[in-house]
Amino acid sequence: MIDQYKHQQLQIGLVSPQQIKAWANKNLPNGEAVGEVTRPSTFHYKTDKPEKDGLFCERIFGPIKSGICGCGNSRASGAENEDERFCQKCGVEFVDSRIRRYQMGYIKLACPVTHVWYLKGLPSYIANLLDKPLKKLEGLVYGDFSFARPSTKKPTFLRLRGLFEEEIASCNHSISPFFSTPGFATFRNREIATGAGAIREQLADLDLRIIIENSLVEWKELEDEGYSGDEWEDRKRRIRKVFLIRRMQLAKHFIQTNVEPEWMVLCLLPVLPPELRPIVYRSGDKVVTSDINELYKRVIRRNNNLAYLLKRSELAPADLVMCQEKLVQEAVDTLLDSGSRGQPTRDGHNKVYKSLSDVIEGKEGRFRETLLGKRVDYSGRSVIVVGPSLSLHQCGLPLEIAIKLFQLFVIRDLITKRATSNVRIAKRKIWEKEPIVWEILQEVMRGHPVLLNRAPTLHRLGIQAFQPTLVEGRTISLHPLVCKGFNADFDGDQMAVHLPLSLEAQAEARLLMFSHMNLLSPAIGDPICVPTQDMLIGLYVLTIGKRRGICANRYNSFRNYPNLKVNYNNNNSKYRKDKEPHFSSSYDALGAYRQKLISLDSPLWLRWNLDQRVIGSREVPIEIQYESLGTYHEIYAHYLIMGNRKKEIRSIYIRTTLGHISFYREIEEAVQGFSQAYSYTT
C-alpha cells in the first residue's frame, strides 16, 4: 500500500469484510459482479484452461496471457471504452497478465470462522477482550458445547449441551431426537449460540471504552488491596493485574487503529493471487502445485457441503450441521496455520502441508528470503573484528568498502574543488588511489553516518548508526560494547553496512539510531551496553596486580620519597625490584612504565589528594614508623599517611598498580566527557 506521503509499505492487520470484497470484486459491463471463488477446481483436464469460478479463474484473477481472453480473442490493454475492456463472451478483462500477481478473490463462508492467529496466539486477543478462559472459547468454537442466548426473554430450554450426559442423563432418550426434528433450526437461531458465530456476537456487543474504564477500576482496586501475606493469593492478584493492563492496551489499540473486534471472526476468506500459489507442469505429465491450493480446495469443498446442508436444514440433522461447521473451522485453521491443532496436517504421502504461516514465517519465509535478503545499492558486507581504540559511536570501515560506498560523494567533491574536470578522470584518480582521494574521502566520511546491520534483525537494536573511520585491512572494526544489541561476537560474524542518502535518513540516523543513544534495552529497560567476556577478562588482568602480602609493605624501605626525584636513566640506585617505588603523580608512573622500569601489575605508591574519607577512617594502622626528625609514617593495608612532628598530615600515598591507574583515568575521562556533553545539551 502507499500512504499519504507516497511511501510504499506493507501492513498486516485486520480488515473488514467489505474491504475484502472490495479487493476482489469486479463489475462486468452486463452488471455481473465477479470475485467470489465457488469451485475447488483449478484447470480443465482436457483443455488445460482455468475453470470458471475456480481457484485460477481468469474472470476473477485476470488473463494468463496479456491482452488475450479465455476465448482467444485479443485487444490492446487500456481501452477507453468500458464495454470493450471485457470480452463479451467469457467476461475476461483485457489487461496485462501481471495482474494475476496482485488480484485477489474471496470465499463466502457459510458460517463464521474465527481467525486462528487471534484465538490461539499467545496471548489470545479474543480471550483477552472477552475476559474468558481460552479452553472454554475453543470448546465453543469447535462445537463441544453451546450456550443460551442472554437476549431472549423466553425461558431457555438448553444451557450447556456438552453437560447433558452429566446433568440430565435421564432425559437423553428424549433430547437426542429433538436435534433431528425440522423445528430445531428455528429453536437454534432463537435460543442458543454455538461456534464462531457466538464469538462474533459477543465481540460485536463489546464497548471498548467501557472495557478500558472497568479494567482500570478493577486494577486500582487490586492495587489498593496490597499484599495479603498469602503467597498464592498474591500471585493470583499479580497475574490478574498484568492481564488487566494487557486488556486495556489491546482495547486502546483497537480504538486507535479503527478496527472492530468482530473482524477477528471471518465471514469472507481472502484468496491469494494465483501467481503466488502457482501450478507448474513438468515433463512426463508431472504437476507440481503449491500446498496452499490443496488447502483452499479443502476449505471450498467443506464450505460447499455446509451451504448445501443449510439449504436443506429441515431435512439435515443438527448434529451433522454442527459437525460440518467444525470441519469448515478446522479447514480454515489448517490454511492459516497448519500446526494450530497440535499435529500438522499431512497429505496422502505423509508430507506436511505448508500453510500461510509457514510460507510467511522463518528464515525461508516470504519476507526474510524474498524481500529482506536482497542486495541493495550503497551497501557492503564484511567480517567484524574488535576495535578497542574506537569510541562507542564509531566503526572502522576498510578502505575498499569506504571508497565504494562514498564514491559518488568523492567524485562530486573532486569536481567541485576543480581537482578533476569530469567524472571519467575522477574515477581514474580513485582507481589510481591518489592522495587527494583519501583526503576528500575522510572529509566526506566525517559528516556522514553509516548503518550497521546484523541478520537476523529481531529487534530495533539489530541495526544502529555509527560514525565511520578508515582502517587498514578488509574487516569492519566494531566497539565491543555494542555487540550485545546485535547479538554478535568476534568469531567470524558478518555485518552489512548501509549508507543513508537522503537528509531525512541521515537526520534519523543521527537523532535516533546512533549507538551511544541506544544504551538501554527497549524490551525491559536494562543496560544493553555492558562489558562481557573478553572485556571482563581484560579488566581483571589489568587490575589484578601482584598479590604481595602486607609484610612486603612493613619491611619495605620508605626512604624513596617523592622528594627525591627518580632518575629514570639510572636503574641501579632508586629502582630495585625488591622495593615499591613512590610517585608524585600518575604521569610519573606512566613515564616509568614507558621506560620499562615498572610493569602493569607492579605494586607502587601514588601520592593522593588529602581525602577526608581516608583521614576520617577508623582503620587501625598496621605499623607506625618514626624518624629522627619527628616525622612519622602510618602504614595501612592499602595506603600510607605521612605526618610531621606536629601530628599534621603532610601527604597520603595509596598502594596501587599502573593497571588500576590506567583504568581509573579512562573512567575519569569518560565521566568528564559525559558531563561536558550533558552541560552542552542543557
Swiss-Prot record:
Q: Which gene encodes it?
A: rpoC1
Q: List this protein's GO terms for biological process.
A: DNA-templated transcription
The protein here is known as DNA-directed RNA polymerase subunit beta'
Required co-factor(s) are:
Mg(2+); Zn(2+)
Q: What is its main location?
A: plastid
User: What does the record note on quaternary structure?
Assistant: In plastids the minimal PEP RNA polymerase catalytic core is composed of four subunits: alpha, beta, beta', and beta''. When a (nuclear-encoded) sigma factor is associated with the core the holoenzyme is formed, which can initiate transcription.
What keywords does the record list, in alphabetical order?
Chloroplast, DNA-directed RNA polymerase, Magnesium, Metal-binding, Nucleotidyltransferase, Plastid, Transcription, Transferase, Zinc
**Main EC class the enzyme belongs to:** transferase
The similarity annotation says: Belongs to the RNA polymerase beta' chain family. RpoC1 subfamily.
Q: Which residues bind Zn(2+)?
A: C69, C71, C87, C90
